[in-house]
UniProtKB/Swiss-Prot annotation:
It comes from the Bacteria. One of its GO terms (biological process) is fatty acid beta-oxidation. Heterotetramer of two alpha chains (FadJ) and two beta chains (FadI). This is 3-ketoacyl-CoA thiolase. The gene is fadI. The active site is at 99 (acyl-thioester intermediate), 392 (proton acceptor), 422 (proton acceptor). Gene3D superfamilies: 3.40.47.10. Catalyzes the final step of fatty acid oxidation in which acetyl-CoA is released and the CoA ester of a fatty acid two carbons shorter is formed. It catalyses: an acyl-CoA + acetyl-CoA = a 3-oxoacyl-CoA + CoA.
Amino acid sequence: MRQALPLVTRQGDRIAIVSGLRTPFARQATAFHGIPAVDLGKMVVGELLARSEIPADAIEQLVFGQVVQMPEAPNIAREIVLGTGMNVHTDAYSVSRACATSFQAVANVAESLMAGTIRAGIAGGADSSSVLPIGVSKALARVLVDVNKARTTRQRLTLFSRLRLRDLLPVPPAVAEYSTGLRMGDTAEQMAKTYGITREQQDALAHRSHQRAAQAWAEGKLAEEVMTTYVPPYKNPFAEDNNIRGTSTLADYAKLRPAFDRKHGSVTAANSTPLTDGAAAVILMTESRAKELGLHPLGYLRSYAFTAIDVWQDMLLGPAWSTPLALERAGLTMADLTLFDMHEAFAAQTLANLQLLGSERFAREVLGRAQATGEVDDAKFNVLGGSIAYGHPFAATGARMITQTLHELRRRGGGFGLVTACAAGGLGAAMVLEAE
């Protein structure tokens, strides 16, 4: 094992995660229908600051992410600063790393803390699949640009006359990889076939995710980390995730047809994460700054790792690549972990990563490592359910996982937890967390 890389400031301070909060997550076109991501971000950051009782001017940086960009608010981070009463001089910028976006936001704030340029910051992300940047065709876009340069009405009419009826149809956001044309579900199908993952195994994991998430809500474990929201017309509160199917049975999952490979596939809407709206954020500080403010951190960021792999085959194996690197940098092994939380983009992707984490052959022949990362103990894995149940507002999922894992670690008396996710473009992320 290589030497561990401690995440500390120049003064030796650990990176403290003081608190975290999220909105409830809502299925597309339900509770947050018509609410843009920037407003979801304002909701969660405003409430996070109010609950923490930290002076607004103590936050020196806000790094926030959004995957489905809105052209009218390209820097969501700055809009959140301006819309929540934070100090107008607060540094703010936006990031995007697909499904690992808030992992990146956390890493960026941590790096600012380690560099000594700030002592406290906020990281998070928000996405809306209900408020989308519906575009126009390339032909219409080109004509509209040319029309702006036309000098006469005749010239403008000539330009418009070149358009066909189909050129006027709206264009929804792309769901396929730009470089390959493959949808993530196509890759999940490929991975299911490559690694022998059956439909029954996928449905069982999805059912497990919903059952555990429903139990977590029933036992009150999520109440502290999920805010109650009010949206226009402000009549009814929205306080719990609305995708969780706590009363479903395995027989219900078996009824659904494959969503991607219609004839021979096994990936369905039920064993995949749904399109979701929501936001999540965490406050990070140097350990000494937290003490100055009289705060007791949820936990600490021990290490992180980002990886990138080929997009044509096994594109969603990011966790199998990033997990051993994050563990190595933390100076830990799989056996040292109390909790292991993996983003469930698809049950097939999740099961493939779990399989390869325990594979000696994959470790030697693909990762170039002497031994497997290690089998993941089911008693430590996604103990409160995962993204298949909660949903997946792309940029918010990482912050949800971090907050949820730290709270659960504290309930168990402390220890180490690892959170990891795959992301579009063959990207992967993993972070090791510590709670006392």
